[in-house]
Amino acid sequence: MGNIVAIVGRPNVGKSTFFNRLIQRREAIIDSVSGVTRDRHYGKSDWNGKKFSLIDTGGYVKGSDDIFEAEIDKQVELAIDEADAIIFIVDVESGVTSMDEEVANLLRRVNKPVLLAVNKVDNNKRLANAVEFYSLGLGEYFPIASTNGSGTGDLLDALIEALPEIEEEDESELPRFAVVGRPNAGKSSFINALIGEDRYIVTDIAGTTRDSIDTRYNRFGFEFNLVDTAGIRRKSKVKENLEFYSVMRSVRAIENCDVCLVVLDATRGFDGQVQNIFWLAQRNHKGIVILVNKWDLVDKETNTMKEYEAMIRREIEPFTDVPIVFISVLTKQRVFKAIETAVKVFESRSKKIKTRQFNDVMLPIIERNPPPAYKGKYVKIKFCMQLPTPHPQFAFFCNLPQYVRDPYKRFLENKLRQEFDFQGVPISIFFRKK
């Protein structure tokens, strides 16, 4: 898992423009994850070979442009707690404002790398004016212009130099199942229901990520780590920024796990915040199991469960091949079924299909249902294979890969899932020139 870098600053200084500038740079960004919020506020980055996750905290600030300083302070405090480094963006046009000084006061008190970026420096006059930001007491500043990218390379070079080293994960480590979801959905209670009276627990160890607890657990003859990141922070610090807090915690948990157990509160439904976490897990290619908790509190009729499940699948389209387990941590209803399902998803995600077997199954399907002609030309797929990657990826070799349209790609994915059982596992399909 890479470091987390938070972009902070008051409204209208160019945080989102700076973020968008970075995620459009192919040499810097290896993947941009949409769906974390309605706008794109989360990206996985790689600058000069160093990976980190970039979060634009500006997207989590509520209210109008003249938002209260107290709310800005809470947002910045959360970023300080969760991030490994912070980029503080100010606006040379406005000069040093009282809100800038308030944020700087917070940042000076932390023992983490803080990089001061003076934005909108696009001419020599503004370059000279940027000197006044020395008064914030944060040391060297970096003049940048988010609109054209000027200065961002120097800033990123300094960021990489400042980021703490993170030990690479040992591939021989036990599988990690992360319990994620919005606050108060029952994440910690779910783990407590599993371990409270269970004699299969081996030990509790400090997690590799800050504030997480890894519980080494053995069930169904399968040993793994349960990762709980919930209920650790003081509620008084997060009650005004629950969505920001939840996503920040989920980023760490999801990037460092194999399977995500996404817990939702049955009385609240599959809301936007749960959807954000679901898409975050999907775009990180993690196995996914959805747990509908507090099912004992829902008034039920004959088809209540079926209708609730259908509602969830509509919300997560087009990736609907995900197991959904209805549980109650209070009564321990189906809590072990949830773990059994997560183990199956992990095994599916780790599955390796032999090339000959894969071709024997898929090529006859393709022959019966070939890709539609495009611009009068026919695509002929002659060979396919699973790629040697940590999560399932498949390559189909053909004469005209550029002419394969998305509907046919979805058709192949559906057939793959039917034939090889990849429930709960995001898969990637590529078409390559033979």
Swiss-Prot record:
Keywords carried by this UniProt record: GTP-binding, Nucleotide-binding, Repeat, Ribosome biogenesis
CDD domains: EngA1, EngA2
InterPro entries membership: G_ENGA, GTP-bd, GTPase_Der, KH_dom-like, KH_dom-like_a/b, P-loop_NTPase, Small_GTP-bd
Domain of life: Bacteria
Matches recorded under Gene3D superfamilies: 3.30.300.20, P-loop containing nucleotide triphosphate hydrolases (3.40.50.300)
KH-like domain sequence ranges: 351-434
GO molecular function: GTP binding; ribosome binding
Pfam families: KH_dom-like, MMR_HSR1
Sites where the protein binds GTP 1: 9-16, 56-60, 119-122
Residues that hold GTP 2 according to the record: 181-188, 228-232, 293-296
GO BP terms, alphabetized: ribosome biogenesis
Function: GTPase that plays an essential role in the late steps of ribosome biogenesis.
Family, similarity comment: Belongs to the TRAFAC class TrmE-Era-EngA-EngB-Septin-like GTPase superfamily. EngA (Der) GTPase family.
Protein's name in the database: GTPase Der
Species name: Christiangramia forsetii (strain DSM 17595 / CGMCC 1.15422 / KT0803) (Gramella forsetii)
Encoding gene (name): der
